[in-house]
Amino acid sequence: MNKNIRNIIIVSLFTVGCGWLGIWLNNLTGNTAPPLQSLGALVWLTTPALSGFLLRAFGGDGWKDSGFGLNLPSGWMWYLLALLVYPLASLLTFGLAALFGILSADGFAVQGFGAYLSAAGVIFVGSLMKNFFEEFAWRSYLTPRLEAVGVKPILNHVIVGILWTSWHLPYYYYFLDRALLESAITTSIPVFIALAYVVQIPTSILFGELRLISKSTWTVFLLHQVINAVSMPLLMNGFIEVKGALAPIFTPTNEGVFVSLLFGVVGWMLMKYRLKQVGHA
């Protein structure tokens, strides 16, 4: 078997299995800590990225396409895109949801915008380690390595999106506090997970293409940080409320179908631009 394909399979298996291994370790050791602060959670969070690092160092992949460099100042516009794309997509979706009468923003009036900024800041800082390990697994390793073996761009992003969502399953079902999860979604948990596989594909197109066109993993790390910080307080802290059958589609959080479609459109445009540039190189 080609070593590049072998290494991709290894990281993929670790990605899908590490969370369940973490749960097993917690059960084996009789863990009494909150699940998200346990040894099992550490195994779940770090294994995909660490397996990629090890394969780059010792498995023959090398570091050339790892995206560790910032690619600044020449790549400044990709960092600007990372900062703006989700707030703009969320704002547009927010307006449509309000127009359809399914969204209330009374929480902003009651709590104040300062409270929202404070919550967003806490989440931004609290997400740093998680998003480092996520992005240095998916976009630092899987996306460029799939491209290196000749996988077409859309299939590349579909594969990464499916693995990305599958990695989250133990998080949703075990590590994350159930009440906290329910406060941040607009559907039942099974429906939320089914929709996650749908919305993660166009989201993966945006993340993957931004990573490839910027030649840096730090752009998508920043994008992930912004999405978590801006999105999570909206429902979880009660700043907005989205109700009705259209809620999963038009929630302005990153779990919303419409937001993910906007992500996919931007990602598609980046892909077309990138491939055009490659064709002219």
Where would I find each of the regions flagged by the language model?
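C-terminal membrane module of polytopic membrane proteins
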Residues: 225-281
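Membrane-helix interface linkers and caps
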Residues: 22, 26-82, 95-112, 145, ...
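Membrane-interface helix/loop boundary segments of multi-pass membrane proteins
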Residues: 133-166, 179, 212-216
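N-terminal membrane topogenic signal
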Residues: 1-12, 253
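Membrane-interface interhelical connector segments
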Residues: 142, 172-188
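Residue-level signature of the transmembrane alpha-helical core
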Residues: 16, 46, 83, 124, ...
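Functionally important transmembrane alpha-helices
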Residues: 20-21, 158, 183-250
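Alpha-helical transmembrane segments
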Residues: 7-19, 45-49, 81-90
